[in-house]
C-alpha cells in the first residue's frame, strides 16, 4: 500500500482495520504510482475503510516531513467516534480526480482494478 514502507521504516506497527465516519470521499489521485486521497466533505460522504497504525512519537515529525503533497496528515473521525491522525488530501487535488468512494476503501478499489486488468 502507498507509504506502508515509510510507516514501517519509521517504526510504526499495524494496529487494526477500521472505517471513517460517513463524512469522507476517496479519490484516485492522478499520476503514478496509483495513490488514494481522502477528503472530508460536508454532506454526501461515505464511510471509508482505513488502517490504524501506532508510531513512536519521536519518529512522527520525521515521518510527516516525508509525506508528499497534495497529501497531508490531519485528524480523521472514525465510525466509532474516535479521532486519529491520518492521511488527508488537499481539496484542490481532487478536481478532475476519479471518485472511488463506492468501493469503500483503497484495498477494495485496488483488488477490483487488479481483477479487471
How should each PLM-predicted stretch be described?
Residues 1-117:
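Glycine-aromatic micro-motifs
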Amino acid at each position: 500500500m502507498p507509504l506502508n514502507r515509510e510507516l514501517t521504516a519509521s517504526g510504526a506497527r499495524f494496529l487494526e482495520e477500521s472505517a471513517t465516519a460517513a463524512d469522507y470521499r476517496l479519490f484516485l489521485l492522478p499520476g503514478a504510482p496509483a495513490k488514494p486521497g481522502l477528503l472530508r466533505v460536508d454532506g454526501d460522504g461515505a464511510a471509508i475503510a482505513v488502517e490504524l497504525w501506532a508510531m513512536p512519537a519521536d519518529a512522527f515529525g520525521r515521518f510527516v516531513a516525508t509525506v508528499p503533497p497534495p497529501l497531508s496528515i490531519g485528524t480523521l473521525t472514525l465510525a466509532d467516534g474516535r479521532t486519529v491522525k491520518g492521511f488527508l488530501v488537499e481539496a484542490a487535488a481532487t478536481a478532475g480526480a476519479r471518485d472511488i468512494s463506492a468501493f469503500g476503501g483503497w484495498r477494495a478499489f485496488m483488488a477490483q482494478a487488479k481483477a479487471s486488468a
